[in-house]
A protein has these predicted regions:
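C-terminal segment of classical bacterial N-terminal signal peptides
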Residues: 17-18, 38-45
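Bacterial N-terminal signal peptides
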Residues: 9-12, 30-41
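Positively charged n-region of N-terminal signal peptides that target proteins for export
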Residues: 1-3
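Short, low-complexity intrinsically disordered segments enriched in A/P/G/S/L with frequent Arg
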Residues: 20-27
Length: 369
């Protein structure tokens, strides 16, 4: 892993001149493609958006929050913490030799939508529970193994190649965690929580907001909702790119070689956050999250078409079209994330168990006096 990172650092140093200037000519993209192929695995080992892209999504989401949103979220320290945590799930992926962690964390970053059909499933009729979904993947494989490509055990040490991704379940579950966090905070604030308890509850909320942003950001990256994640696979009538390094170029190579990501101007494209999901309908939030993935999926072919037309090459005078699509996806990710944060705050219910305990504690303390 360390050797790969060193080589990748060398790649960035060669591809981008000192000072972050414009690379000289098309060899930049060719060099990136050649070197990235040496270090990036085929499969879902690569990350969606580099750290700066994930930071941008979380920062854009913060721009969507209304004036009345809890003030502790808006302090400079909290905003930086939320932005930093955008990269946390990818840091977990850096522990390549920790197979239980890889098994748990890896599939939460993607969903290969086209592969649902292989299991007789459709995006509109997926179960809202992740283990119900994994069962629906396991049963056809067990009943008709001949219909599925064999899995190489040497490349499946973390036992994730039987899966096609769990990203929408991860997002929905994090929404529930955030609702719980707001419920706990309100209970501590209203029923005699100590300053330390209130501060810890606030820190829990900040943590969940930051980490969940990663998965929402992943699903704004078109290559994380398709089987064509590392180059086009199967029938290819349009002659789209098949090189596995395409993923890394979209994650961050393009932005690094075209001036980076400027969050300020993009923030102007963010509207105020709105409610997502009807809490009276248990499956509604999941359906809204799936709709978000399906919208992202609409950009898969346009993204490959831009590559085919060299509009994702820094030296092309029409590279602005490639930047527009990718920046648009960052904005969509930030918008969705802001909506989910806002919804969790608005829809948080009473934590009756905690309220009861706090009430009993307060009464006991009063009696002692």
């Amino acid at each position: 892993m360390k050797r790969s990172l060193i080589l990748f650092a060398a790649l960035a140093a060669v591809a981008l001149p000192p000072g972050g200037g414009r690379p000289a000519g098309r060899p930049c993209l060719v060099l990136f493609t050649a070197l990235a192929a040496l270090v990036l695995p085929v499969g879902h080992g690569a990350f969606a958006w580099d750290y700066e892209g994930h930071r941008a999504v979380n920062q854009l989401a913060l721009a969507a929050l209304p004036q009345g949103f809890p003030a502790f979220i808006k302090t400079p320290a909290a905003r930086e913490r939320i932005a930093f945590l955008a990269g946390e799930p990818d840091r977990w992926r850096n522990q390549g030799d920790d197979l239980p962690l890889a098994h748990f964390n890896g599939p939460d970053h993607y969903l290969d939508l086209e592969n649902l059909e292989d299991y007789g499933l459709t995006p509109e009729a997926l179960p809202i529970f992740r283990y119900d979904f994994t069962a629906k993947l396991a049963l056809p494989r067990a009943a008709h193994p001949e219909k599925f490509p064999p899995i190489d055990p040497a490349r499946n040490k973390d036992h994730t190649r039987e899966l096609i991704g769990l990203a929408p379940w991860a997002i929905t579950e994090y929404c529930g965690k955030l609702k719980s966090g707001f419920s706990c905070l309100k209970a501590f604030q209203d029923y005699g929580g100590t300053p330390e308890e209130i501060a810890n509850a606030q820190e829990n909320i900040i943590y969940v907001m930051g980490v969940m942003g990663h998965y929402v950001g992943d699903c704004a990256q078109p290559l994380h909702v398709t089987k064509h994640h590392h180059g086009w696979v199967g029938d290819n009538p349009h002659g789209f790119a098949t090189n596995s390094s395409f993923h890394a170029w979209i994650d961050g190579g393009f932005f690094r070689n075209t001036g980076g990501i400027k969050v300020g101007p993009l923030s102007g494209k963010i509207r105020p956050a709105k409610i997502v999901g009807d809490p009276t309908k248990p499956d509604d939030l999941f359906k809204q999250v799936m709709a978000y993935l399906l919208e992202t999926h609409k950009q898969v072919e346009p993204l490959y078409q831009l590559e085919k037309e060299h509009k994702l090459s820094p030296e092309n005078e029409k590279a602005g079209e490639g930047r527009a699509l990718l920046e648009g996806q960052l904005v969509k990710g930030g918008q969705m994330l802001g909506d989910l944060w806002f919804s969790a705050w608005q829809q948080a219910t009473e934590d009756k168990y905690l309220i009861r305990n706090l009430t009993e504690r307060k009464a006991a303390n009063t009696e002692k006096k």
